[in-house]
């Protein structure tokens, strides 16, 4: 391909195709340094490359064709050479100006030869050597100057040689020079070539001359010395050469070339060398005029070079053509064949006819044909590699055709007038040449870019070689060898040429040698050389430079050495030179080439390199054949052939140098200057040897070393270059001049550039100087050699070449040393072969042959001539396993790239290529696979990068390894940030690809010995931002990381029920479709996130459920009609591995806000979620059908339960139960007990309300209250449960069972109060910074315990005992312990009575309950009331003691403890007492019965007295009085004895008295019994505590300071007080209460409930109650501030309490509550003021909050009764005056009531004091009246219960 391009480029440039031979060769060399890859093998390839790169006058390639087309065979030949050289040069220029010049050097050599021909006829006469010299110089200068000229030349290909050649130059020579100029100093080499004695010598010198110096090279002048070359021995040749050199001065040289008539093909060639040594056609020289004609045709300058001599130069142009393209090498070969003819021309002076005959193709044509055919096989390879134009076979054919044409075959091939031209060529080959070459040129040029040349070649039967053929036959051969070898190799080194060349060489060599006679041999040698050249080209392709430096380099070296060796062996001089060449390296290669030329056959062999050399040798050996076939003397043809072969063998420049050298000593290896040439050759040989040695090393330098021309090697090694230069110079003047070290380095530089090897790159720099044309030529040769080298590996004729190439290719170690990346088995490609041989010896030869075959296949597959296969491992079992890697210079291709390219190339093609080199190959079992198996697809992931620079070759291992390191850093960072771990993650890039400016990296991530799944690795790297990933990779990522394969779940129709559809808007068309796995995966991830989000939202409903894992599988993505590009996503979801029904999944997604969904999906959501199958399975309906009835049944049951429980609920509303829930459960238990005691206390309170019982109520109040308190704390729960069981409606409390209701209410109140007090206590504690909670808790507990004790006290007889039982009092205070012991003793006795009475009372109460239930009420408090009655009895009995206890704080303190101790008994008794109270047993005093009845009535009355004022005061009193209740109850004990009860004949009075008595009994129980024991303890505690706390504790606040002990007792008294005072109020103070406090209605509800009810009332009352509570705390604090002890129990507390009460009384609610508190039995009226303060306390507030209490109180106790009972019970101890005073305070609200109650309280207290010691007095207290009153009350209550209930509700 490259060759074709080269040719085309040359044509474009206007370089004559004929010139390609010599020029091309040089050109290639130059190119190769310049272009690097292109410089391989062929000038054309190089040229193409540059052309592509530069918009240089690349077009010249066609011009080249044109030049070739020049009419004159001579001009044509010159043109060919020039084209060859110039093309190369131009190519280089096109590609890189610097490179161009470098590359030109080699082409210059060829051009030089052309130039020689180009040179004036004298140059021709000079034999080829003179012409060559001239050409070389001309070429060199021309090259430098005429870079563009070649284009011009091409422009005028058909025109007269002058115009055509010189687009810049007048003659065809000008085009050649142009090319050369581009090539720069190629001509120099030609100068060095002396005409060998043999005919061929002259041609060779011409060829050498053909090497044209670059424009800047003055050295071309020296080159002219080439005259020694004249094969004919004609001395005119040198002059011609000189002329050429002159023309080499650049543009003018062409003219000189023109001077060369076709008769001296050499001269003509020299003439060609003129400008750029464009007329390197010198090879056309005399040898084969027919050849020349062909060359002319190729050149297309035929017209320009009408003259035969000029025609030859024109031929050179065609040669150039071949050089430019891959085929050009073949063309060069053809040219060489032509050259062979040319040599006849050159010999023309000497043996023009003989050579002409050869060229004539008389023999040649036949031979040529054969050879062409044979060559074609070779050529085919070459062609494929080189030119698209010429088939490889064509190229080969062309080459051989060229020879043939020169022989006659080429002519024949040249449709135009191949034979005729050839025939005419002898006489006036230029004309014929023009025609013939034109034809050839046309074909060549198109394929190579030198279409004309290619075509010409094809026409000639070697279409690729057409251009080459055009090169003079004799010279053409040389040129062909040089040009093809150098130019093509250089360009082919690009890839194409090399492979073909290899094939070509073997075929060519064999066929050519055999087929061609002397002329043919010469040509054949060129052919062989061409083969070699092609190999060289291949190497150059590797690098045209590659050839030099790349493995081809080593191969080339080896080949060259072998060639040289062969040449040396075959030809004595050549052999020696050849030998020297290996030694000298750079010089030697030239020498070898020259030597080969000189040796003719030997030279050819050597030139070919192993194969070529062999072939050449054979050809040389067959000089007879040649001679026989060729008309011209065999010697001449042989010489020509040798020269050609030598040239071909070497890179074109090298060949040129060799030709020059040969020209000097062509026959002897020193023609004109035999000694000089010999020495030069020797030097070259030495250099070559050295270089050869290096070359095998596979370094560019080595390659260069391998070549005689140091220039190529100079890239790597300047020394070599120098030696080469020296050698060349030594060999011949011209040669020496040409071989200037500077120039050579420059050429090599170009080649090196082409070569991937760094050495080559270095070499180009080394060869930067291009002073000597010879150097340029040498460089060209070197490039060619390099190219050849690779081809040799591939070449058939590899007897020598193959091993050398093999060594180079196989020696991976040597190659690896210069490779740009670290080699490992990961870069190896594995190919498995089946061989026919059972036993295969794995030898170096087998390795070499396989390497050659693989190289050939790779070059064809990559379409590059500089690609080489390096076999690293060769294993054999039943088959052969080959492990190799592909390189291009220093670049190593990734296995994936090689596998892909070979896969495209095809197994059959690879097999065919391998069979050419390994005949035993049976088949290819495994075409190509990675040596290490690749990880599975699901391990692989890809990253897509943008803006990867063109400089980065993504196919190279260097790029891959760099990206691996960067990716590793990125992954390590991601792992550290995301996983907080650090492990040695490794990256292995599997493949790279480039599409639409985005580079895709496919790689795997390994963790030690295992690989990460692609999904895992991609998700890890995706955690990093795109910016960060771009930072690590240095390129912005288009896709950060994406798995190559996605694990897909089942997406068949079986999952249809689970499908869900979501419609998005704004989805790009490129994203829709399942093929776009990336988008599908992204949407799956985002949808899974949405499911997780919905689950998180649902967690608040299902806290226990843990988030499961959702997996989303995309089923399909499709476009749907609608605006904004809607796309429909169908997917289904797995939750914890189980699929979700579509309906369920859609429902889940529908819970997510559409906006959030859009933000998550990054697209507008048109449809959130819609199930595909919308009807859920039938089983759902079944489930629903089953669940529905169950649900209905459940609802019905719930409703029934609610209805059945409604009564209880209603009863509890006013009761403590409502508040109890507010209280802690433990408090409930206490509440429960309190309720029992409280209810009883309430009954007792009711009794005291009846003035008769007023005395009892005080002690009873205290005791019961304390009990209640204890119950509050300890028995609230029990109370609750009991209440729940016995829950009565509020009206029940007021009903006949009012005793019970009163008791429960008081009990309830007590719990409520406890709760309220706790609240207050908390508030107070907050204010005091006291841990209220603890105190409250303690208070509640103690309160409960006191309540428990109080409940037993509730029984009037056992009240004292119950109180004593209260454990709290006893443990608390030691003094109380004594009292508690007394009380306990009393209690024990009382308990027995109480138990008795309880049974009766419970029986009675049960009856009452039944009645109440019938009426819709449940007398929950009844039980408590019974207990309360029992306790009351006890309290009455112990009243005096309890009073004392009350007075004594210690006793109080003990009392609570006692209560707590007795709590268990009390609890048990509570239940029983409740029952007994419910049905008072006869054992109980009438008082108890009265109390029992009274309570219900009280409850009724409470409802009746539910006036707002009463409630308010009640509440106030409850709060304040409760605490006071303690103190007062204690005080009251004394005062209460002075009964303040005013006996009232009316039932109301009786009931009031009952309540009073009950209250007093409770107060006595708490104050006396509990008070002395418990109460006194409580009192003591109260003393310790501020009075207010004590007071508060009664409601619930006092407990805090007292640690709850006092609080409990206090609380009870309060509850009892509440219950009792309320009845008192009810009887006497109701009206005033109403007046005093507007809010009573609410309190009345709570009234019956004691504390709990008060609390309820607080909540019920609402703001008022809360206000009261809020104010309550302050008073409570005030009270707290003054400890109870501090306050004189009576006065102080009274005063404060009164004040507080008054204050509260100011508030309606507080006033009301205060009044009830005052009424409590435990605290007689004195407490009225205190109760308000307590109400101010939180406790009071809580009481106030009790709405139920007021109602119950209203039902059971009239406010007046309360007030009366309160003063009596409350202030029993305080003086009556105190009571009044206190009353006066509340009296603000209702003074009369206060006053009235005071006396009654006093009386009751007194009576209580009297009665307390014994139960009898209490029992005797108007028992009959009380019973009667109770009964009446019960009746009234029964009547009022309904109303009451309603009110309470």
Swiss-Prot record:
Disulfide bond entries:
none
A cellular component term (GO) from this record?
A: membrane
* Cell location: Membrane
Q: Which InterPro entries match?
A: KIAA1549 (IPR024606)
Q: Which UniProt keywords apply?
A: Coiled coil, Membrane, Transmembrane, Transmembrane helix
Specify the protein's topology with respect to the membrane.
Answer: Single-pass membrane protein
Q: Where is the composition biased (Low complexity)?
A: 1769-1786, 1795-1809
Region Disordered, annotated ranges: 1-70, 142-166, 213-242, 529-586, 1258-1338, 1460-1546, 1656-1679, 1769-1819
Q: Where is the composition biased (Polar residues)?
A: 1-10, 529-541, 552-586, 1290-1319, 1463-1482, 1537-1546
Q: For this UniProt entry, which segments traverse the membrane? A: 1180-1200
Q: Tell me which stretches of the chain form a coiled coil.
A: 958-986
| Domain of life of the organism encoding this protein | Eukaryota
User: What Pfam families does the annotation carry?
Assistant: KIAA1549
Family to which the UniProt record says this protein belongs? Belongs to the UPF0606 family.
This one is known as: UPF0606 protein KIAA1549L
Which species is the source of this protein?
Homo sapiens
């Amino acid at each position: 391909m490259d060759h074709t391009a080269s040719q085309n480029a040359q044509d474009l440039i206007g370089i004559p195709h004929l010139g390609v031979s010599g020029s091309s060769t040089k050109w290639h060399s130059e190119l190769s340094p310049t272009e690097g890859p292109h410089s391989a093998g062929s000038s054309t390839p190089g040229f193409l490359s540059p052309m592509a790169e530069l918009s240089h006058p690349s077009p010249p390639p066609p011009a080249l064709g044109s030049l070739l087309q020049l009419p004159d065979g001579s001009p044509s030949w010159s043109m060919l050479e020039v084209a060859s050289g110039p093309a190369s040069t131009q190519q280089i220029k096109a590609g890189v100006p610097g490179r161009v010049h470098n590359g030109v050097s080699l082409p210059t050599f060829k051009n030089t030869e052309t130039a020689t021909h180009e040179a004036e006829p004298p140059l021709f006469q000079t034999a080829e050597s003179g012409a060559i010299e001239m050409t070389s110089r001309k070429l060199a200068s021309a090259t430098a100057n005429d870079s563009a000229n070649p284009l011009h030349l091409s422009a005028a290909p058909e025109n007269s040689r002058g115009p055509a050649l010189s687009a810049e130059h007048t003659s065809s020579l000008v085009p050649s020079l142009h090319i050369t100029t581009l090539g720069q100093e190629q001509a120099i080499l030609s100068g060095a070539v002396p005409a060998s004695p043999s005919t061929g010598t002259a041609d060779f010198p011409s060829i050498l001359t053909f090497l044209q110096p670059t424009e800047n090279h003055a050295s071309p002048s020296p080159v002219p010395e080439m005259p020694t070359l004249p094969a004919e021995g004609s001395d005119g040749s040198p002059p011609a050469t000189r002329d050429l050199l002159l023309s080499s001065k650049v543009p003018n040289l062409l003219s000189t070339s023109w001077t060369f008539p076709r008769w001296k093909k050499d001269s003509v060639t020299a003439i060609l060398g003129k400008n750029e040594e464009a007329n390197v056609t010198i090879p056309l020289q005399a040898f084969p005029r027919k050849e020349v004609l062909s060359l002319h045709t190729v050149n297309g300058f035929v017209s320009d070079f009408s003259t035969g001599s000029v025609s030859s130069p024109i031929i050179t142009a065609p040669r150039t053509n071949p050089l430019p393209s891959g085929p050009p090498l073949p063309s060069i070969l053809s040219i060489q064949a032509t050259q062979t003819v040319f040599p006849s021309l050159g010999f023309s002076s000497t043996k023009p006819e003989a050579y002409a005959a050869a060229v004539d193709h008389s023999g040649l044509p036949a031979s040529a044909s054969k050879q062409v055919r044979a060559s074609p096989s070779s050529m085919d390879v070459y062609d494929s590699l080189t030119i698209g134009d010429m088939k490889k076979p064509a190229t080969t054919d062309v080459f051989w055709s060229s020879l043939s044409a020169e022989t006659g075959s080429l002519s024949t091939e040249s449709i135009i007038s191949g034979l005729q031209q050839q025939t005419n060529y002898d006489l006036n080959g230029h004309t014929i040449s023009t025609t013939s070459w034109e034809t050839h040129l046309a074909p060549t040029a198109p394929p190579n870019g030198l279409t004309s040349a290619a075509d010409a070649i094809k026409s000639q039967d070697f279409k690729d070689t057409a251009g080459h053929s055009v090169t003079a036959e004799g010279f053409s051969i040389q040129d062909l060898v040089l040009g093809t070898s150098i130019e093509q190799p250089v360009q082919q080194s690009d890839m194409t040429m090399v492979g073909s060349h290899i094939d070509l060489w073997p075929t060519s060599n064999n066929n050519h040698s055999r087929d061609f006679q002397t002329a043919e041999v010469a040509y054949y040698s060129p052919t062989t050389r061409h083969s070699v050249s092609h190999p060289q080209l291949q190497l150059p392709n590797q690098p045209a430079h590659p050839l030099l430096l790349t493995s081809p380099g080593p191969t080339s070296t080896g080949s060259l050495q072998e060639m040289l060796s062969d040449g040396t062996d075959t030809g004595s001089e050549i052999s020696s030179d050849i030998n020297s060449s290996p030694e000298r390296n750079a010089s030697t290669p030239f020498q070898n080439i020259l030597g080969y030329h000189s040796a003719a056959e030997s030279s050819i062999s050597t030139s070919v390199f192993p194969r070529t050399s062999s072939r050449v040798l054979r050809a040389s050996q067959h000089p007879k054949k040649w001679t026989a076939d060729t008309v011209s003397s065999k010697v001449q043809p042989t010489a020509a052939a040798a020269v050609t072969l030598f040239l071909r063998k070497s890179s074109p420049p090298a060949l040129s140098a060799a030709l020059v050298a040969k020209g000097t000593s062509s026959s002897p290896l020193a023609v004109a200057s035999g000694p000089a040439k010999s020495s030069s050759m020797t030097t070259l040989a030495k250099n070559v040897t050295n270089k050869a040695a290096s070359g095998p090393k596979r370094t560019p330098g080595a390659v260069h070393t391998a070549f005689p021309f140091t220039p190529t090697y100079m890239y790597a090694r300047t020394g070599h270059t120098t030696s080469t230069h020296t050698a060349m110079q030594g060999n011949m003047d011209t040669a020496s001049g040409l071989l200037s070290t500077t120039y050579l380095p420059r050429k090599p530089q170009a080649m090196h550039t082409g070569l991937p090897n760094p050495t080559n790159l270095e070499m180009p720099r080394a060869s930067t100087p291009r002073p000597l044309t010879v150097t340029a030529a040498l460089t060209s040769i070197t490039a060619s050699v390099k190219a050849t080298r690779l081809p040799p590996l591939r070449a058939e004729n590899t007897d020598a070449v193959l091993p050398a190439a093999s060594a180079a290719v196989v020696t991976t170690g040597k190659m690896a040393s210069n490779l740009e990346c670290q080699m490992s088995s990961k870069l190896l490609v594995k190919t498995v072969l089946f061989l026919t041989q059972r036993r295969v010896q794995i030898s170096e030869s087998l390795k070499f042959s396989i390497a050659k075959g693989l190289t050939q296949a790779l070059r064809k597959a990559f379409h590059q001539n500089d690609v080489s296969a390096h076999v690293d491992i060769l294993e054999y079992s039943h088959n052969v396993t080959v492990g190799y890697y592909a390189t291009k210079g220093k670049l190593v291709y990734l296995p994936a790239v090689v596998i892909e390219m070979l896969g495209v190339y095809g197994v059959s093609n690879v097999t065919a290529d391998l069979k050419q080199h390994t005949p035993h190959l049976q088949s290819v079992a495994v075409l190509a696979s990675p040596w290490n198996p690749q990880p599975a697809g699901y391990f692989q992931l890809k990253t897509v990068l943008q803006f990867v620079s063109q400089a980065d070759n993504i196919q190279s291992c260097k790029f891959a390894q760099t990206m691996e390191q960067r990716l590793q850093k990125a992954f390590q960072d991601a792992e550290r940030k995301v996983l907080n771990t650090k492990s040695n993650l490794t990256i292995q890039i599997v493949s790279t690809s480039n599409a639409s400016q985005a580079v895709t990296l496919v790689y795997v991530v390994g963790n030690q010995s295992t690989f990460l799944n692609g999904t895992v690795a991609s998700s890890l790297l995706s955690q990093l931002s795109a910016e960060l990933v771009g930072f690590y990779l240095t390129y912005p990522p288009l896709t950060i990381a994406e798995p190559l394969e996605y694990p897909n779940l089942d997406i068949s129709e079986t999952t249809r029920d689970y499908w869900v559809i979501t419609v998005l808007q704004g989805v790009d068309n490129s994203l829709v479709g399942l093929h776009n796995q990336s988008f599908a995966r992204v949407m799956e991830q985002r949808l899974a996130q949405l499911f997780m989000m919905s689950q998180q939202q649902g967690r608040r409903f299902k806290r226990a459920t843990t988030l499961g894992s959702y997996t989303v599988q995309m089923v399909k993505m499709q476009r749907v009609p609608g605006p904004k590009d809607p796309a429909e996503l169908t997917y289904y979801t797995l939750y914890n591995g189980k699929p979700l029904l579509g309906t369920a999944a859609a429902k889940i997604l529908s819970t997510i806000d559409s906006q959030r969904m859009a933000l998550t999906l990054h697209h507008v959501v048109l449809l959130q979620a819609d199930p595909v199958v919308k009807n859920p399975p039938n089983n759902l309906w079944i489930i629903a059908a089953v669940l529905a009835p169950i649900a209905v049944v459940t609802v019905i049951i719930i409703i029934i339960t609610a209805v059945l429980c409604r009564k209880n609920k209603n009863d509890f509303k006013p009761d403590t139960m409502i508040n109890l829930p507010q209280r802690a459960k433990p408090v409930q238990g206490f509440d429960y007990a309190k309720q029992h005691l409280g209810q009883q206390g309430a009954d007792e309170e009711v009794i005291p309300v009846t003035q008769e019982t007023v005395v009892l109520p005080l002690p009873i109040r205290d005791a019961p209250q304390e009990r209640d308190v204890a119950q509050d704390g300890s028995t609230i729960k029990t109370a609750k449960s009991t209440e729940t069981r016995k829950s009565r409606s509020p009206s029940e409390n007021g009903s006949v069972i009012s005793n019970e209701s009163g008791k429960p209410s008081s009990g309830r109140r007590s719990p409520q109060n406890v709760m309220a007090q706790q609240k207050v206590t908390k508030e107070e504690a907050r204010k005091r910074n006291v841990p209220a909670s603890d105190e409250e808790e303690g208070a509640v507990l103690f309160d409960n315990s006191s309540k428990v004790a109080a409940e037993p006290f509730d029984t009037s007889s056992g009240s004292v005992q119950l109180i004593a039982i209260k454990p709290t009092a006893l443990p608390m205070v030691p003094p109380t312990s004594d009292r508690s012991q007394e009380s306990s003793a009393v209690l024990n006795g009382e308990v027995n009575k109480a138990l008795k009475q309880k049974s009766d009372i419970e029986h009675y109460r049960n009856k009452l309950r039944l009645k109440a239930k019938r009426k819709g009420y449940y007398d929950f408090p009844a039980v408590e009331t019974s207990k309360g009655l029992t306790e009351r009895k006890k309290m009455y009995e112990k009243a005096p003691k309890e009073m004392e206890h009350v007075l004594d704080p210690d006793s109080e303190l003990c009392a609570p403890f006692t209560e707590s101790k007795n709590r268990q008994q009390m609890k048990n008794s509570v239940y029983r007492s409740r029952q007994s109270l419910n049905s008072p047993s006869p054992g109980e005093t009438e008082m108890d019965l009265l109390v029992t009845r009274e309570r219900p009535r009280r409850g009724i009355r409470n409802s009746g007295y539910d006036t707002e004022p009463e409630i308010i005061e009640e509440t106030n009193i409850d709060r304040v009085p409760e605490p006071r209740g303690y103190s007062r109850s204690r005080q009251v004990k004394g005062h209460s004895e002075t009964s303040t009860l005013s006996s009232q004949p009316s039932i109301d009075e009786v009931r009031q008295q009952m309540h009073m008595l009950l209250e007093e009994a409770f107060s006595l129980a708490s104050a006396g019994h509990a008070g002395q024991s418990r109460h006194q303890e409580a009192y003591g505690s109260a003393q310790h505590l501020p009075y207010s706390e004590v007071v508060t504790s009664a409601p619930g606040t006092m407990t805090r300071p007292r640690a709850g002990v006092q609080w409990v007792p206090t609380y009870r008294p309060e509850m009892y007080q509440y219950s009792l005072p309320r009845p008192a109020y009810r009887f006497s103070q109701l009206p005033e209460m109403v007046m005093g406090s507007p809010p009573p209605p609410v309190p009345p509800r709570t009234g019956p409930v004691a504390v709990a009810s008060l609390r309820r009332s607080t909540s019920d009352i609402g703001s008022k109650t809360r206000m009261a509570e809020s104010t309550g705390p302050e008073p409570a604090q005030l009270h707290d501030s003054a400890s109870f002890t501090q306050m004189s129990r009576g006065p102080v507390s009274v005063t404060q309490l009164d004040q507080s009460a008054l204050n509260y009384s100011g508030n309606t609610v507080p006033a009301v509550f205060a009044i009830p508190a005052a009424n409590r039995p435990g605290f007689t009226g004195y407490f009225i003021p205190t109760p308000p303060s307590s109400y101010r306390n939180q406790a009071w507030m809580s009481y106030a909050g009790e709405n139920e209490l007021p109602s119950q109180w209203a039902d059971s106790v009239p406010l007046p009764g309360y007030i009366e009972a309160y003063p009596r019970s409350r202030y029993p101890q305080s003086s009556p005056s105190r009571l009044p005073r206190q009353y006066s305070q509340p009296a603000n609200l209702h003074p009369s009531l206060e006053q009235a109650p005071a006396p009654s309280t006093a009386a009751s207290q007194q009576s209580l004091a009297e009665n307390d010691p014994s139960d009898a007095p209490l029992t005797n207290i108007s028992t009959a009246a009380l019973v009667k009153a109770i009964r009446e009350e019960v009746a009234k209550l029964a009547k009022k219960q309904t109303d009451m209930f309603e009110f309470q509700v």
